[in-house]
Amino acid sequence: AFLLENVKNLKSHDKGNTFKVIYNALKNELDYDIHYDVIDAGKVVPQHRERIFIVGFKEDTPDFKFPELVDKRPVLGDVLEDEVDEKYTLKDGTWNALQRHRAKHKAKGNGFGYSKNDKVTSADLKSWTPEQKKRFFADKKGIAKTLSARYYKDGAEILIDQGKKNPRRLTPRECARIMGFPEKFKIPVSDN
């Protein structure tokens, strides 16, 4: 038996041809009974992350079904640390650059993922209502957007509200928690 996992768009890549090649190789050339499904990890961890899972068995398994996932996940606020080093707070230059980038894309009619609001400045944050913050920052009572491999390049995908201070990015431990890693998991690299 085997289990393969990949991005959900594997099914549609190259108009579905990539998936067909993989499926046919596993089914017809290697003689596996194949089952696949797109599953959102957001039902078990506090992160929206849709992935395709492909399982294969050497014997026929007509009754195989992927398990139904029950919404029993923590929310984002459950995995956030109480005390966070200042190095995770966005510097004014980074925060302003993100907003300029967003404004440029908004003017072109493109989306830009870190915000749903118009451009704001650090000074604006001080007067925001809780409702305004809820629309702008990651919802601590919900789940996070998909955490990409390039998160630490700019930290713009998931921003954590810090009241009157600039927002912050997630710590490596918080990222591990979002992906379901246990507390005993050792993070082998620096976060620089």
What would you call each of these model-derived segments?
Residues 1-57:
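Conserved Class I SAM-dependent methyltransferase catalytic core
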Residues 25-29, 36, 50-192:
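S-adenosyl-L-methionine-dependent DNA methyltransferase catalytic core
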